[in-house]
Every structure is written in C-alpha cells, then in structure tokens.
Amino acid sequence: MTKNYIFITGGVVSSLGKGIAAASLGAILKARNLNITIIKLDPYINVDPGTISPIQHGEVFVTEDGAETDLDLGHYERFIHTKMTFLNNFTTGGVYSQVLKKERRGDYLGATIQVIPHITNAIKERIILCSKNSNIILVEIGGTVGDIESLPFLEAIRQMAVDIGRKNVIYIHLTLVPYIATAGEIKTKPTQHSVKQLLSIGIQPDILICRSEKTVPLHERKKIALFCNVPVDAVISLKDVNSIYKIPKLLKNQKLDDYICNYFKLNVPEADLQEWEEVIYAEKNFNNTIVIGIIGKYIKLPDAYKSVMEALKHAGFKNKIKVDIQLINSQEVENKNFQILKNLNGILIPGGFGDRGIVGKLLSIQYARENHIPYFGICLGMQIAIIEFAQNVVGIKEANSTEFDPQCKYPIIDLIKNRPNNSSKNYNKIENRINLGGTMRLGSQPCKLSANSLSRKLYNQEIIIERHRHRYEVNNLLFKKIEAAGLQVTGRSQKNNVVEIIELSNHPWFLACQFHPEFTSTPRDGHPLFIDFIKSAGKHKKNFI
C-alpha cells in the first residue's frame, strides 16, 4: 500500500487553527474513502502535556489507550471518526527521552549523539510507526516556522521527502494574511516572508492556506502564488467563520481535496459531505436557547474546557437547542455570590486539580441541588458533589478529599490505593512525589450500570466503556452512610468496584460521573449524558419562565 504524507506547518503567528485545518482536510479525504490518520508533533520539552497547566496549554485530551495528548487530537477524533492512540501525538521531550534511554543502554554503540541524525531519525521512526495502517498520513507540526523549538521536526519532515520520494509528500503551509481595516487592504507580505523562512530550511510548500478575516481575492492569491512559487489553485483562502464545522465545506469548495488527489494520482470517489451539511443545519436551526454555566478554575483560557464545550454544543444540536455557555470562575461564588448563578438553566462542573476554588464549586452544587437546577458533574465534579451531599445533607461536616486536606477526619475521597506513587497520605508535598506524569488512572475502563437507573436508560446497555483521568476516587468504606441518605451509586467499575456514576433521585436531573464523557462526543451523534442534560436544562427554562 502506497503511503502519502501531508505535512502541515504554520507561519507568521501561532493559534491560526492548524489543528482544525488538518482535521477538516482529513474529514474530506476520509469522505473520499481514503484511510486517514493524523499525527500532532509538539515542539515543547515536556514528555507529554499531562503536567502542563491547562491555562497555558488548554485541555489534556485522553485517548482510549490512556495517552495524555494535545487537545487537537480531540478535533481529529471528532472530525474523522477515527480513534487516536499514544502514537498520534509526541513531543520534543518524548523524543529526547527515548533517544537518551537508548544511549544509556548502549544502543548507539559509542556514537556521539546529535540532533542530526539521532533525534531526526527518532522523529521519522515515530511518524512511520503511526502510519502503519493508513495510506494518507496528515502530520501537523506545532508552533510557528522560525521558532528554534520546531527545527528538529522541520528537518525530519524535510528528510522524509528524500527518504520516501518527493511525489509521496505534500507540504501545506498555513499562514496569516492580515486585513488592514484602515487601508481596506489585505497584506500578503507576512506570508511571503514566512515562506522564505520555510525555504531557508529546505522546504518548498506545495499548498498555502491563507487564514484571513475576509476572503482573499483572486488577484491577491495570484500575487502570493507568484512570490511563493506555488500554483494559483494551490493558494487556498480560509476566511474566519462562526463555526469550525463549516471548514470542511469551505476547503472542499476550493477543491483542495481534488488538488491533493491529483498530486498523489489517487483515483477515488468524490467526497460526500452530507453529514457536515446536517451538522451545520442543526447548528443554525434551533427552537430554544438555554444558558449553561461551567464552574471552573481555568476559565482564563476557554480551551481548557474545549471538549466539554464542544460536547454541550453537540447535545444542543440533537435537542434543537442553542447552548449559550457561560464560563464562571468558581472563586467568584465563594462569598455566596449566587446572583451569577440565577440565570443558569444548568450547571456543569468539569475536571480539575487542587484546592483553589473548591469552596465556590461546593456552593454551586448546593445551589443546584436546593434549587432543582440540572447538575452535571465530571471527574472532580462528581467528587465534590459527594462531599457537598455528605456535609450538607448527611451532616458529616468533616467529609472532604485528601487532595484538599490530607489530614481530614472523614476522607470520603482518597488517593487510588493501587496506583504507582500513591502510597503517601502527604502526597501533596513535593518531597513525597516520585512522578506526577503518567501515573493516574488513565484511558478506557469498563463500568457496570445499575438496572432502572437514569444512566442505564440513557446508555441503553449494562456495560459501558468510558475514558478516565484521575488520581483520587471515592472511599467505599465511608460511602455507605452517604448512599443510605439517598445519593445513589448507579455505575461501578468492573475491575476494582470504583464508584463511577452517582445520581440523586429526588431532583429533576442530578448526575455525576468519574469518567470524562466529553472525550467521546461527536457533532454527529453527541453523547447520551450530555444530550439528556441539555434536554433537562431546556425543560428547566420552560418551567421557570
């Protein structure tokens, strides 16, 4: 099977949307019956993003096999119907770590280890390993051309054209074409300079995708083509749109997929983008608008909750409801500032770490429970819901998590006992930690649902498999008293009897789960828990108008 590689780089500035562009192109090529995978190369020194602050990096997307990866892999999964693995994302730190381990073992037989060839060879090996079962491999290189961090990756993809043949490689460069409002002009000079930087590395781009506030007109595309040495048909205008789900059609309308298929000499059927037409239609046509509050601590960067926000939108599509998402800093609720919660039709508390903002989250849950507002807790959102119920309903004021208070008298939430490095009650002290990275309960785990529960009804099956990312769990030894007071456990893991789902029966909609359902939601199908949460929030709005 011939393998064709499409390398996507970015220029001028960061955050241009290379991930969305790669996912959208992948969706079009997948619709042409091509076997696609997408790889993200990240040029930072961290081994993976698992220990990076969400405020700096955005969410950590967890794959089925438990890899902690870049949020772009979430876009890849949602757009191309393909599950990602640990092979689909690697970093400079991961590559260097691998090479250094080999050097310590003596695998290099005394050679002097250098960026070229050892680091670049390791990068190429990882790309080839991930492409084993695909015939079209899209590779997104993080960062911006010109950054020193990206150089080993750029050199590796330059070499790949030599190794496998230039005819099997396409270089796509995504650049910014700014619109200067005061002059009423689009400026192409930044793109020209960015391409020159790429040429200095030895890479001639085959296709330019020009991100701009407005459509780049033909005469400007001709100018870019002339000075950047690419055909006019290969200069693609990517104007700003109000929905990422419009991008596949935008690229298809400019025949980007035709250009690629002709380049690779692929005889494949035309792409049918009907499913994307349906998504766009659902996004525009709704009967109701509701307000959902995400109560979190990382709201300075909305990308910290990217998959949660997308899953809420997907659920809105399925219910013909427009979801207005409000990101609320949990610390703003700490002084019982319930005014900011009054207009919400649903409250969601997502995953997180640490004790900052916990009081505000507890108060938000209490407000949702007492005022019969639909509540959805995810990961930490489930753990805090249990603590709130234990303190305010059962009357166990000492109930807490050892994450927030290692010496608490009633540790209803405690470290997972059978995980590596989790033996110390003083785990939060730096000196007692061995490794933070890669030591949580990660990836897909089976869960058994209770008969006659809401979750069983929504999933319509007894055994489900969902993705996890947590270091703390419910303490089963202390939970019986809480369960007896009315907080039902309706889902437990099959392996270790871990509490996975809780429900409150005397409430319109109060459900929380230890796993992360947002990672498996798609714009076409949504996710059953999110869909019913939004449905309940819609009912709440009607009841309180």
From Swiss-Prot:
Binding of UTP, residues: 14, 187-192, 223
What the entry lists under CDD domains is as follows: CTPS_N, GATase1_CTP_Synthase
Q: Where is the active site?
A: 379 (nucleophile), 516, 518
> Which function does this protein serve?
Catalyzes the ATP-dependent amination of UTP to CTP with either L-glutamine or ammonia as the source of nitrogen. Regulates intracellular CTP levels through interactions with the four ribonucleotide triphosphates.
The segment(s) forming the Glutamine amidotransferase type-1 domain are: 291-543
Mind listing the UniProt keywords for this protein, alphabetically?
A: ATP-binding, Glutamine amidotransferase, Ligase, Magnesium, Metal-binding, Nucleotide-binding, Pyrimidine biosynthesis
Task: Kindly state which reaction or reactions the protein catalyses.
Answer: UTP + L-glutamine + ATP + H2O = CTP + L-glutamate + ADP + phosphate + 2 H(+); L-glutamine + H2O = L-glutamate + NH4(+); UTP + NH4(+) + ATP = CTP + ADP + phosphate + 2 H(+)
Query: What is the activity-regulation note?
Result: Allosterically activated by GTP, when glutamine is the substrate; GTP has no effect on the reaction when ammonia is the substrate. The allosteric effector GTP functions by stabilizing the protein conformation that binds the tetrahedral intermediate(s) formed during glutamine hydrolysis. Inhibited by the product CTP, via allosteric rather than competitive inhibition.
| Family annotation (InterPro entries) | Class_I_gatase-like, CTP_synthase, CTP_synthase_N, GATASE, GATase1_CTP_Synthase, P-loop_NTPase
**GO CC annotation, single:** cytosol
Family designation: Belongs to the CTP synthase family.
Any extra remark in the record? CTPSs have evolved a hybrid strategy for distinguishing between UTP and CTP. The overlapping regions of the product feedback inhibitory and substrate sites recognize a common feature in both compounds, the triphosphate moiety. To differentiate isosteric substrate and product pyrimidine rings, an additional pocket far from the expected kinase/ligase catalytic site, specifically recognizes the cytosine and ribose portions of the product inhibitor.
Q: What is this protein called?
A: CTP synthase
List ligand-binding residues for CTP: 14, 147-149, 187-192, 223
How it assembles, according to the record, is: Homotetramer.
Q: Name one GO molecular function term.
A: identical protein binding
Q: What is its EC number?
A: 6.3.4.2
Instruction: Kindly report, in one word, the top-level EC class recorded for this enzyme.
Output: ligase
Residues noted as binding L-glutamine in the record, renumbered to the chain: 352, 380-383, 403, 471
Q: Please list the GO biological process terms of this entry.
A: 'de novo' CTP biosynthetic process; pyrimidine nucleobase biosynthetic process
Entry binding sites for Mg(2+): 72, 140
Pathway per its UniProt entry is: Pyrimidine metabolism; CTP biosynthesis via de novo pathway; CTP from UDP: step 2/2
Answer yes or no on keyword Metal-binding. Answer: yes
The positions annotated for binding ATP are: 15-20, 72, 239-241
Tell me the segments the record calls region Amidoligase domain: 1-266
